[in-house]
């Protein structure tokens, strides 16, 4: 029965709410929120009044104690971020003060005890803040207390005598890797003969401190360069490979580098640096230039007072050097031409400076809006080097008019080196860019020891500045562009170090790719960082980064277990598997290129034509590099054996069939390098001034020479490669010596070449008749080819030449495996018609119309 007052729905809801309130444990009038409870109430899980002492602790005689609120509070995100930045700051300071001290807890505790004991003994704090002094003293103290640290003392007190030579290398790789680290440090000796400024010695000391803890990846060998100084090479260098081949072929002592050096001793200038530079720069030694500080005229001519640029610049102040550098800069129109050529040629594979920022800052310099005292020293050096490198690249394409030519190239390089010497005490982005550019210049001119030292300083400065984390001092770009610039410069430093390792065998300064390509974010397209009116080259940059990672890892794994190319026969199958694995990785890299990069090697009007061809050159260059041990193994084990003895399992050796695909791939890559180099030469884009493409073609010529010696393959383009090398190798003394060494080896062997020359005619006799005139190109070459084809009596609609020669693998794999690489001397390869020259359809139709209508050009 419902109660009497239960007359509506609202009364029912009120009754239910009152019943719910009465069921609560704490009455409404006595309910109170307590912000914190004491530790005793927390342990007993009872209600605490929040007072001190609380009611529960008073009732039960116990100690009422509250927890510290500051200790319980979790740190904020801002505090954690600031703490991590604080830790980075201390790490950077430790890198500067103690570059060779490990940053583990044990070493830091020893450092702290040493500093405390030094301060307690009354030592001055300033004496403890000298970079590189704390770690050496700590390691000395640790060596007296603990015998286990003797190796650390040895690494911290390495001496660098300029006249000493490294210990003789043993043939065993394991024993070489345990030798003294002097062999990996001697690259920094005598950084440059024209390093007149005393501060340039800091480059050597910084590079030495950086590479003290670096372990040599490959053994090194001591040879003599063109100047009689020792250079240290590992098996990845082409010079090492050529010396190993000539030693296996038992050449006479008359072909050693020392005897070849005698003929060129009179041609070597007294200045060390100028002999390694292009010959255009050697004019400074013969014709001193007296210039003075003045303003640049509009025609690009410069007038100076009585300052001899060939004299010692150490007497000049930094202010005077800035004035000289400012007046050596060409006008804006000329500088833009050279800068565009530089950005198009070299920023496809490296990244040095944002083009838009360079253009704006150069315009400010040219307009004289900034006082010479406040000029950015780093940008002055960057501007000089960019203009110089762009000038050399532009000279490869065409002959420049007189008003555009630079008359003080040598002075610009020397002044830039002096400006960089004043930047060594600073760690800024502009100083890293300037040192990096100078390292690239020395690398391109073949002065690898200087390039190695400057590159080591640039890498150390970039690490100290924190470029890997996007920390720069550049305020002219936004946050995204600044981070992207830092990433690109870090990748560029690693790519240049990879090139030094691949070409010259110089051990990398740091572990270039510790986590593969995951150590840094790959570059992306940022419009603010691209050059105006020029296509973006970011995809070429990403491709060359992946190439460098594959090459360094592959060559390291390939050569680390080999000893002077004299591998044991039982280890040859493992080596063969390694080479085939590298082949597949290189092919995958090439297949992942863009369509323009794969098929852009024919259109010479494309602005990225040289970059596209260079990617293909690098691919074939890697194939040739990794194939050298296979060829050397074949030379030492099978070359002296008769062809009928090539049976499977002979003397526990692998059969010749196992080497078919590898030697064929190497031979085709060597031929492709010659063809691509000829294409660059005909297009006027061959880098004749610099060393990079010369080294690739030189390595290909060595391989072709070895194929000719062993009578392997057909249509060997060795003569064409020698002609190209003669055209390219006349710029530096070192390249001349290396080319003469290869030619003298060919003359001794007197090879019967399979190219367009009679049988039994020596190869050395054909040097003078190697197509020394420029070959025709374009429509005339195509017309001559049609005429030659029509007069060869070949039926139309059929394959040209022998059916077996259409497939490239047929010339390497005949029916009988024992005759796979032997050239049949009875065949006349000169009767095969030539391949048609490349001719754009637009040019062909235009010339046809001109001939039909007799319009004339």
Curated annotation (Swiss-Prot):
- Ranges annotated as biased composition (Polar residues): 803-819
Check the record and name the Gene3D superfamilies matching this protein.
Zn(2)-C6 fungal-type DNA-binding domain
State the function annotated in the UniProt record. Answer: Transcription factor that activates the nmt1 promoter. Regulation of thiamine repressible genes. Negatively regulates conjugation during meiosis, by inducing negative regulators which delay conjugation. Involved in thi1 regulation.
* Protein name, entry field: Thiamine repressible genes regulatory protein thi5
- Source organism superkingdom: Eukaryota
**What keywords tag this UniProt record?**
DNA-binding, Metal-binding, Nucleus, Transcription, Transcription regulation, Zinc
Does the keyword section mention Plastid? no
Q: Which Pfam families match?
A: Fungal_trans (PF04082), Zn_clus (PF00172)
Report which gene this protein is encoded by: thi5
Q: Where is this region: Disordered?
A: 152-175, 797-819
Where does the UniProt annotation locate this protein? Nucleus
GO BP, sorted A to Z: DNA-templated transcription; positive regulation of thiamine biosynthetic process; positive regulation of transcription by RNA polymerase II
**Compositionally biased tracts (Low complexity):** 159-175
Q: Name one GO cellular component term.
A: nucleus
State the Gene Ontology terms under molecular function. Answer: DNA-binding transcription activator activity, RNA polymerase II-specific; RNA polymerase II cis-regulatory region sequence-specific DNA binding; zinc ion binding
Main subcellular localisation: nucleus
Q: Which lineage is the organism of this entry classified under, starting from the top rank?
A: Eukaryota, Fungi, Dikarya, Ascomycota, Taphrinomycotina
From the UniProt annotation, which stretches of this protein bind DNA? 38-64
By its UniProt entry, which PANTHER family does this protein fall under?
Answer: ACTIVATOR OF STRESS GENES 1-RELATED, THIAMINE REPRESSIBLE GENES REGULATORY PROTEIN THI5
User: Has UniProt tagged this entry with the keyword Transport?
Assistant: no
């Amino acid at each position: 029965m419902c109660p009497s007052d239960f007359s509506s729905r609202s009364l029912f809801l009120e009754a239910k709410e009152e019943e719910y309130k009465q069921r609560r444990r704490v009455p409404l009038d006595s309910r109170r929120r307590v912000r914190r409870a004491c530790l005793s109430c927390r342990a007993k899980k009872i209600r605490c009044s929040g007072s001190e002492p609380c009611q529960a602790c008073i009732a039960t005689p116990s100690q009422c104690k509250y927890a510290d609120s500051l200790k319980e509070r979790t740190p904020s995100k801002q505090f954690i971020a600031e703490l991590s930045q604080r830790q980075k700051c201390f790490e950077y300071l430790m890198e500067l003060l103690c570059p060779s001290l490990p940053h583990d807890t044990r070493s830091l505790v020893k450092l702290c005890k040493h500093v405390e004991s030094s301060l307690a003994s009354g030592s001055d704090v300033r004496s403890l803040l000298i970079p590189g002094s704390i770690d050496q003293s700590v390691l000395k103290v640790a060596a007296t207390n603990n015998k286990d640290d003797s190796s650390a003392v040895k690494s911290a007190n390495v001496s660098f005598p300029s006249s000493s030579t490294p210990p003789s290398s043993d043939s065993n790789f394991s024993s070489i890797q345990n030798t003294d680290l002097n062999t990996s440090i001697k690259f920094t000796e005598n950084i440059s003969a024209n390093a007149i400024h005393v501060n340039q010695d800091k480059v050597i000391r910084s590079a030495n401190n950086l590479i003290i803890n670096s372990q040599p990846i490959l053994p090194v060998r001591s040879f003599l360069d063109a100047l009689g100084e020792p250079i240290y090479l590992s098996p990845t260098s082409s010079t090492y490979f050529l010396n190993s081949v000539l030693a296996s072929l038992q050449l006479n002592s008359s072909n050693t580098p020392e005897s070849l050096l005698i003929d060129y001793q009179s041609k070597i200038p007294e200045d060390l640096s100028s002999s390694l530079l292009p010959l255009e720069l050697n004019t400074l030694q013969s014709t001193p230039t007296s210039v003075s500080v003045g303003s640049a005229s509009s025609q690009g001519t410069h007038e100076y007072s009585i300052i001899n640029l060939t004299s010692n610049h150490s007497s000049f102040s930094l202010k005077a050097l800035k004035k000289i550098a400012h007046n050596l800069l060409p006008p804006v129109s000329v500088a833009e031409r050279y800068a565009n050529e530089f950005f198009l040629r070299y920023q496809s594979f490296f990244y040095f400076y944002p083009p838009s920022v360079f253009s704006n800052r150069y315009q400010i310099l040219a307009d004289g809006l900034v006082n010479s005292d406040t000029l950015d020293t780093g940008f002055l050096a960057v501007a000089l080097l960019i203009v110089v490198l762009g000038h050399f690249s532009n000279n490869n394409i065409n002959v420049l008019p007189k008003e555009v030519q630079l008359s003080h190239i040598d002075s610009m390089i020397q002044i830039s080196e002096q400006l960089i010497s004043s930047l060594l005490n600073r760690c800024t982005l502009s100083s890293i860019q300037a040192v990096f550019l100078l390292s690239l210049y020395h690398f391109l001119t073949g002065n690898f020891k200087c390039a190695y030292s400057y590159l080591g300083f640039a890498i150390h400065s970039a690490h100290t500045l924190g470029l890997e984390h996007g920390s720069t001092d550049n305020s002219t770009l936004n946050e995204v562009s600044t981070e992207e610039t830092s990433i690109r410069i870090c990748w560029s430093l690693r790519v240049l170090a990879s090139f030094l390792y691949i070409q010259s065998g110089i051990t990398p300064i740091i572990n270039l790719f510790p986590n593969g390509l995951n150590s840094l974010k790959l570059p992306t397209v940022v419009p603010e960082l691209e050059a105006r009116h020029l296509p973006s080259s970011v995809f070429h940059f990403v491709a060359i980064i992946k190439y460098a990672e594959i090459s360094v890892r592959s060559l390291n794994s390939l050569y680390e277990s080999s000893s002077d190319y004299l591998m044991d026969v039982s280890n040859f199958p493992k080596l063969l598997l390694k080479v085939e694995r590298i082949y597949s990785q290189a092919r995958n890299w090439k297949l992942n290129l863009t369509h323009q990069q794969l098929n852009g090697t024919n259109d010479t009007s494309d602005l990225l034509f040289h970059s596209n061809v260079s990617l293909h050159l690098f691919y074939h260059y890697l194939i040739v590099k990794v194939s050298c041990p296979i060829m050397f193994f074949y030379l030492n084990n099978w070359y002296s054996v008769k062809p009928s003895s090539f049976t499977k399992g002979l003397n526990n050796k692998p059969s010749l069939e196992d080497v078919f695909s590898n030697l064929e791939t190497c031979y085709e890559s060597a031929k492709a390098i010659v063809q691509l180099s000829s294409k660059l030469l005909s297009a006027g884009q061959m880098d004749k001034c610099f060393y990079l493409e010369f080294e690739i073609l030189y390595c290909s010529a060595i391989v072709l020479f070895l194929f000719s010696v062993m009578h392997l393959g057909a249509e060997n383009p060795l003569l064409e490669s020698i002609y190209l090398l003669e055209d390219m190798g006349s710029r530096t003394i070192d390249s001349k010596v290396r080319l003469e060494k290869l030619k003298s080896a060919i003359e001794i062997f007197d090879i019967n070449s399979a190219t367009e020359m009679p049988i039994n005619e020596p190869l050395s006799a054909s040097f003078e008749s190697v197509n020394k005139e420029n070959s025709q190109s374009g429509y005339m070459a195509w017309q001559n080819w049609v005429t030659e084809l029509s007069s060869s009596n070949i039926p139309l609609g059929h394959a040209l030449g022998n059916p077996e020669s259409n497939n490239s693998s047929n010339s390497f794999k005949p029916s009988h495996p024992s005759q796979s690489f032997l050239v049949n001397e009875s065949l006349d390869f000169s009767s095969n018609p030539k391949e048609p020259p490349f001719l754009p359809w637009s040019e062909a139709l235009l010339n046809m119309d001109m001939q039909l209508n007799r319009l004339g050009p």
